[in-house]
UniProtKB/Swiss-Prot annotation:
It comes from Influenza B virus (strain B/Nagasaki/1/1987). GO terms for molecular function: host cell surface receptor binding. Keywords: Disulfide bond, Fusion of virus membrane with host endosomal membrane, Fusion of virus membrane with host membrane, Glycoprotein, Hemagglutinin, Host cell membrane, Host membrane, Host-virus interaction, Lipoprotein, Membrane, Palmitate, Transmembrane, Viral attachment to host cell, Viral envelope protein, Viral penetration into host cytoplasm, Virion, Virus entry into host cell. It is found in: Virion membrane; Host apical cell membrane. Glycans are attached at N25, N59, N145, N166, N304, N333. Homotrimer of disulfide-linked HA1-HA2. This is Hemagglutinin. It is a single-pass type I membrane protein. InterPro entries: Capsid_hemagglutn, Hemagglutn_HA1_a/b_dom_sf, Hemagglutn_influenz_A/B. GO terms for biological process: fusion of virus membrane with host endosome membrane; fusion of virus membrane with host plasma membrane; symbiont entry into host cell; virion attachment to host cell. GO terms for cellular component: host cell plasma membrane; membrane; viral envelope; virion membrane.
């Protein structure tokens, strides 16, 4: 008898590309890549995920919440990850806002980037006694409060001269905006100004000329000049038609730093401020969040990691995610394929 050593031969459908030998047939491979299919977005496993800024604020946009619309006040949950579900943030209800004049649509996105967000319990400025006053705090029937009375945004006070004695034109006035957050957070201070047609400007403020406004905080200074008139009547969210408009902006104050606002008539003075800390990873997505996933991917939604790599569309992803590669990867777990040996005839 004879004992012959060798390797098992079989047909091999597996081809791998190697660095030194090019394409090589092997007896077995393990796929390392997957191509995901689009799915709904989900909560990220092992961490808190935020969809809407205020999940319990019904019929409210994130901009409503960020501005403190009277019927949109609530707790913003802490989260390590946030879904940017309003890619082009919609307008706020309440009072018509000139969104194209400022960066105010970025405010909800700014807040989403923080892990912890809370609204101050106290006002940052006493609006009634601010320079140029005394003032009464204006309200609007287009901005109903929880009892359906006239209201306004919680983050701002509409400073209307209280009597005819101070209902006159004024030179620029300056008010300091103190830092009032208590835990070293970033303070996001919302402010703005109101303008209308000449008749309404004289009626409210005693001056029909364009007004000047400037904010300064954390090394950033912004200037505005109000537009007088030329606005068509506009109703927001079923409210009363308004001939006026408001311009709204914000400034970020670091711990212990004071900001300033210089203004004339029509100022919307800051009131309650946002105190925000920590970082939340933000990714574009959609709501609702259904179930849990290892990874959130802008193009594919919620993914559960089954392979270390993926092919397909490359986009931002957060969580325990596979790594994008251009072409599929395989790991050879067999031997190099050799064709069946021919039997030799005995002599």
């Amino acid at each position: 008898d004879r004992i012959c050593t060798g390797i098992t031969s079989s047909n091999s459908p597996h081809v791998v590309k190697t660095a030194t030998q090019g394409e090589v047939n092997v007896t077995g491979v393990i796929p390392l890549t997957t191509t995901p299919t689009k799915s709904h977005f989900a909560n990220l496993k092992g961490t808190k995920t935020r969809g809407k800024l205020c999940p319990k604020c019904l019929n409210c946009t994130d901009l409503d919440v960020a501005l403190g619309r009277p019927k949109c006040m609530g707790t913003i949950p802490s989260a390590k990850a946030s879904i940017l579900h309003e890619v082009k943030p919609v307008t706020s209800g309440c009072f018509p806002i000139m969104h194209d004049r400022t960066k105010i649509r970025q405010l909800p996105n700014l807040l989403r980037g923080y892990e912890h967000i809370r609204l101050s319990t106290h006002n940052v400025i006493n609006a009634e006694t601010a320079p140029g006053g005394p003032y009464k705090v204006g309200t609007s029937g287009s901005c109903p409060n929880v009892t359906n009375g006239n209201g306004f945004f919680a983050t701002m006070a509409w400073a209307v001269p209280k009597n005819d004695n101070n209902k006159t034109a004024t030179n620029p006035l300056t008010v300091e905006v103190p830092y009032i957050c208590t835990e070293g957070e970033d303070q996001i201070t919302v402010w703005g100004f109101h303008s209308d047609n000449e008749i309404q400007m004289v009626k409210l403020y005693g001056d029909s000329k364009p007004q000047k406004f400037t904010s300064s905080a954390n090394g950033v200074t912004t200037h505005y000049v109000s537009q007088i008139g030329g606005f068509p009547n506009q109703a927001e969210d079923g409210g009363l038609p308004q001939s006026g408009r408001i311009v709204v902006d914000y400034m970020v104050q670091k711990s212990g730093k004071t900001g300033t606002i210089t203004y004339q008539r029509g100022i919307l003075l800051p009131q309650k401020v946002w105190c925000a800390s920590g970082r939340s990873k933000v990714i574009k997505g959609s709501l609702p969040l259904i179930g849990q996933a290892d990874c959130l991917h802008e193009k594919y939604g919620g993914l559960n990691k089954s392979k270390p790599y993926y092919t397909g569309e490359h986009a931002k992803a957060i969580g325990n995610c596979p790594i994008w590669v251009k072409t599929p990867l395989k790991l050879a777990n067999g031997t190099k394929y050799r064709p069946p040996a021919k039997l030799l005839k005995e002599r």
